[in-house]
Amino acid sequence: MITSQLLHPASIVVVGASNNVHKPGGAILKNLLSGGYTGELRAVNPKETEVQGVAAFADVKDIPDTDLAILAIPAALCPDAVEMLAAEKQVKAFIILSAGFGEETHEGAVLEDRILETVNRYGASLIGPNCIGFMNSWHHSVFSQPIPQLHPQGVDLISSSGATAVFILESAVTKGLQFNSVWSVGNAKQIGVEDVLQYMDEHFNPEADSRIKLLYIESIGDPDRLLFHASSLIKKGCKIAAIKAGSSESGSRAASSHTGAIASSDSAVEALFRKAGIVRCYSREELTTVGCIFTLPELKGKNFAIITHAGGPGVMLTDALSKGGLNVPKLEGPVAEELKGKLFPGAAVGNPIDILATGTPEHLRLCLEYCEEKFDNIDAVMAIFGTPGLVTMFEMYDVLHEKMLHCKKPIFPILPSINTAGAEVAAFLAKGHVNFADEVTLGTALSRIMNAPRPANNEIELFGVDVPRIRRIIDSIPADGYIAPHYVQALLRSAGIPIVEEFVSDNKEEVLAFARRTGFPVVAKVVGPVHKSDVG
């Protein structure tokens, strides 16, 4: 249940607020203040009357009615605090940062169950427990850093792991990737990855909402809902990429000890992602690189031109693209010779286009214009430009900026010199661009995207598992050990597994009529003895 009070709270209380910004209760209050939250902010601390300039109350029973409560107190104290806040203070959204719940012990799981029963009874949202929090442009209710640049058209990040969410943000910020929201669902007692996707799907506004979703998943509790809502969002124009951690036996065990996650078959995960149209990634760098690619204009083909002033990176990028089934076609003929004549002697235009270390911003502009207007066999351009620190790159990156604004073909900026050209890269990112610092990671990520299937064309239905009916069917099966076909069909339907239509008849005309109605091909099978060879 995702309430408006979670997304846009008019008032927030931090229970366990602290003046020590190195504690979760202090760090989250600091982030709320520095993030410019404009609603009413309250703190609960039994030893202070004021915390970081915010009025503090000794007990939750003393605060006014509040929309959102953030709990940074020991796990054992959380159930009673949630009960008081929901029952007496009209709180409709909770973020529980505390650990020590179902991810650790049975006793902790009991505490979680009590909290869940309370929030459900009062119609409140629950993020966590065991999470870093939630943030959007309205409020930064997280205790971690970095806080990324937030923008309505930025990326939505949903993560099972708080630490992984932080490390994904670290990776993304250096690339210039902006965010719309960050969801750390932790133990996902009430709200998990599937619930967030469902909310985004059911409330999707194509005019205002982010179209990019990045997921880090440790457990898929409801594969049907994940498939249904992910594919629905993609069909509405969204792009989704995900890491599913815990694919190995050891990894599954690690995930279980981390957030109490339940293992999923990796082959089943692969099939689900492919059917939904989700781009599967295997590392944080890959995920954020895919996210950056998603922000650029959509590719219309698989043919790439590479423009560089350094031969080695161009070769490695060519290899990475080729391994992924993408093309770096040879550029030749009169147009290529014409371009070569405008570059310094020794430059190469066969693709990669190498303008040499002495190449100028004007040479880069020329190459981009030729790739856009004159090379018909090129669908997109990769531009690799760094520096050993001998010259500045401002003019070169200004050319990239100008061309990216107007070019009819996507341009992928690969600016590897994030130290020696740090100021230039920062200025480039400040203009709203992203940067791919590593050409091989970019090539691999592009291959993932280009080779990911679209969502299944057939309508995906949200099937439920009817456990009571399954039990009745099993109980009705004869004790001789043979399960007749109609029992199998009933079990599959009750388990929510789609099956093809069947028809049993001993009449030729009826069989032909059925085939014409359903369409070919049709499989014919004898109904009768278990061993068909007994009857010929």
Model-derived features with residue positions:
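Catalytic-core regions of core metabolic enzymes
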Residues: M1-G536
